[in-house]
A protein has these predicted regions:
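Residue-level signature of catalytic and energy-coupling elements of molecular machines
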Residues: 11, 30, 52, 74
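Short, non-transmembrane amphipathic alpha-helical segments
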Residues: 49-73
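N-proximal, solvent-exposed amphipathic alpha-helical segments enriched in charged/polar residues
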Residues: 1-27
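Short, low-order "capping/linker" segments at domain edges
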Residues: 85-100
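Cys/His-clustered metal-coordination modules, chiefly Zn-binding fingers
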Residues: 97-161
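AMP-binding/adenylate-forming catalytic domain of the ANL superfamily
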Residues: 76-82
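Short edge beta-strands and adjacent turn/loop segments
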Residues: 21-46
Length: 161
């Protein structure tokens, strides 16, 4: 019989369909894994935001990964509380976002945000802080489009939620 740690190891293979370098564990959408005495596995996930179109794909991919590794009974449940926050993204996940060319989110408790000031978003390509937001809407709803004024590269920023 599989253990919770075995399941977590398998879930590391399930990637966010919109950002394929980060796993559902690194993104921290997996909230809980329960392995029943009958072998049934229940994985509880929380959407990054209400209506996130990737959640159905993630749920399907989670089931597929576990079934392919011999787990016959899998259920994926979604919970909305507590609400997901970018603060939960792991340090490895943030590093992978940056290496992929997406500026990782700052902490939501950033004092500049609390004061209503514009965020300072370092360029994931060259590290410059001389950047400007081009659009609050990037390639997906959870990202904004920025440009570096030094290396002139456009890049996505994972919005703080």
């Amino acid at each position: 019989m599989q253990t919770t740690d075995d399941i977590l190891d398998l879930l590391q293979n399930v990637k966010d369909p919109e950002i394929p370098v980060i796993s559902v564990l690194e993104l921290a959408v997996v909230r809980h894994v329960d392995v029943g005495t009958d072998g049934k596995v229940v994985v509880t996930i929380t959407p990054t935001y209400t209506g996130c179109p990737a959640m159905d794909v993630m749920a399907t991919d989670i089931k597929k990964e576990l079934v392919e590794h011999g787990i016959a009974s899998v259920e994926v449940k979604q919970v909305l509380s507590p609400a997901w926050t970018t603060d939960w993204i792991t340090d490895d996940g943030k590093r992978k976002l940056k290496e992929f060319g997406v500026a990782p989110p700052e902490k939501t408790g950033d004092i500049r945000a609390l004061k209503g000031e514009a965020p300072v978003v370092p360029c994931p390509q060259c590290g410059s802080r001389n950047t400007v937001m081009l659009s609050a809407f990037g390639s997906t709803a959870c990202k904004a489009l920025w440009k570096c004024n030094d290396c002139l590269e456009p890049f996505d920023q994972f919005k703080c939620l």
